[in-house]
């Protein structure tokens, strides 16, 4: 039985990030004035063939329309598997779910040209799940002159704000981004995106380069526990060369992705450093992520007392230690922990955010923070594909 806000109910959120290893999903109940209640979670991996196809689509090539359409169909099939697992583990039927918020797989992000492309066949996903699908969240923000990213700060403000301290939520996915939550906020139940004190933007590369390097040299999909980096030593000359990138000097609002920070970018930066052992490069890439995040926090949130990390990088203790060291080196007395310390497992944060954006869509409430993205104002985000 519905109570509270008409949009209240159970929502699914699906997120497949720039690591492209699979899709994380959550089933969550939203009720106005109450914190989100997670009912179940699931992860469904991508086959190497799908992953390779997605990577290939990030660079211009032949027959892109056909390849994109087939990859979108394959993504929808994997997303549907994740949804069926959420239904099973939460003991739900499709009719019990108000909507499914799905991010899709970013293959191009060019807000300066007025578009962003998150691959997914939302119509097929609705057909396979018999659940309303809400997708294409970023395009409306871009249409309003924004970056279309990051979109998670509004959700972060909803669940992670504090009345007593300035907090930073740092997502260490393929790309790193931060949300700055000044003291005086607090968990707000259904949340309010209209908060011009909330700030955030993309910082630079994180697991996109760290994973690419370990896969190249160890044939592993990620640096498990940061062990590869721990074997190496940071090369300060290489680090300086990596930091010599115009994006890092660009003012917010700003966003980035694999369009810039990819293997070609890294190989160009490594010219002249072929003598370095692979583990030293890995240590330096880890230091790059820590340095770029710490620089942005120092620049925009000098009064920060706590940094809460989510995303795949939250499972890398070497990266977390490097971030704490980089913050201290910049004079910040900020503790580093994962969002688990605030009651939300780090692997759930982004998929929860897209479930929340679906909830906001059904409420016809804004999902972006225009001071974060640079959009002309707050907008209802997403497009509906009925069951």
Swiss-Prot record:
EC code: 2.7.1.170
Q: What class of enzyme is it?
A: transferase
**One GO term (biological process):** amino sugar metabolic process
- List residues binding ATP: 17-24
| Molecular function per GO | ATP binding; kinase activity; phosphotransferase activity, alcohol group as acceptor
Q: Name one Pfam family in it.
A: AnmK
Q: Which UniProt keywords apply?
A: ATP-binding, Carbohydrate metabolism, Kinase, Nucleotide-binding, Transferase
Identify the metabolic or biological route this protein is part of. Answer: Amino-sugar metabolism; 1,6-anhydro-N-acetylmuramate degradation; Cell wall biogenesis; peptidoglycan recycling
Q: What's the protein name? A: Anhydro-N-acetylmuramic acid kinase
Q: What organism is listed for this UniProt entry?
A: Burkholderia mallei (strain ATCC 23344)
Taxonomic lineage is: Bacteria, Pseudomonadati, Pseudomonadota, Betaproteobacteria, Burkholderiales
Q: Which gene encodes it?
A: anmK
């Amino acid at each position: 039985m519905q109570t509270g806000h008409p949009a209240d109910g159970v929502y699914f959120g699906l997120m497949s990030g720039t690591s492209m290893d699979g899709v994380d999903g959550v089933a969550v109940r939203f009720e106005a004035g109450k914190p989100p209640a997670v009912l179940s979670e699931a992860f469904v991996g991508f086959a190497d063939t799908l992953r390779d196809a997605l990577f290939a689509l990030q660079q211009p090539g032949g027959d892109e329309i056909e390849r994109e359409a087939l990859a979108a169909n394959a993504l929808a099939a994997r997303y549907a598997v994740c949804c069926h697992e959420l239904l099973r583990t939460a003991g739900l039927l499709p009719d019990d779910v108000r909507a499914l918020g799905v991010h899709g797989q970013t293959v191009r992000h060019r807000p300066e040209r007025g578009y962003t492309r998150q691959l997914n066949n939302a119509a097929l996903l609705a057909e396979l799940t018999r659940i309303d699908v809400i997708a294409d969240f970023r395009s409306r923000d871009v249409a309003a002159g924004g970056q279309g990213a990051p979109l998670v700060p509004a959700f972060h403000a909803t669940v992670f704000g504090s009345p007593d301290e300035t907090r930073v939520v740092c997502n260490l996915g393929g790309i790193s981004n931060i949300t700055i939550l000044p003291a005086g906020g607090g968990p707000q139940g259904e949340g309010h995106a209209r908060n011009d004190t909330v700030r955030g933007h993309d910082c630079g590369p994180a697991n996109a380069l760290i994973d690419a390097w370990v896969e190249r040299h160890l044939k592993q999909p990620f640096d498990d526990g940061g062990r590869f980096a721990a074997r190496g030593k940071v090369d300060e000359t290489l680090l300086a060369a990596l930091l010599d990138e115009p994006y890092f000097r660009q003012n917010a609002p700003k966003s980035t992705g694999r369009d810039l920070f990819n293997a070609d970018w890294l190989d160009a930066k490594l010219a002249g450093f072929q003598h370095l052992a692979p583990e030293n490069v890995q240590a330096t890439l880890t230091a790059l992520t820590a340095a770029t995040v710490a620089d942005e926090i120092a620049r925009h949130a000098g009064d920060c007392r706590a940094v809460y990390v989510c995303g795949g990088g939250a499972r890398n203790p070497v990266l977390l230690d490097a971030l704490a060291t980089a913050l201290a080196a910049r004079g910040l007395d900020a503790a580093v922990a994962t969002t688990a310390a605030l009651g939300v497992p780090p692997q759930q944060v982004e998929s929860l955010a897209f479930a929340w954006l679906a909830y906001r869509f059904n409420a016809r409430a804004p999902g972006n923070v225009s001071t974060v993205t640079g959009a002309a104002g707050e907008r209802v985000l997403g497009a509906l594909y009925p069951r």
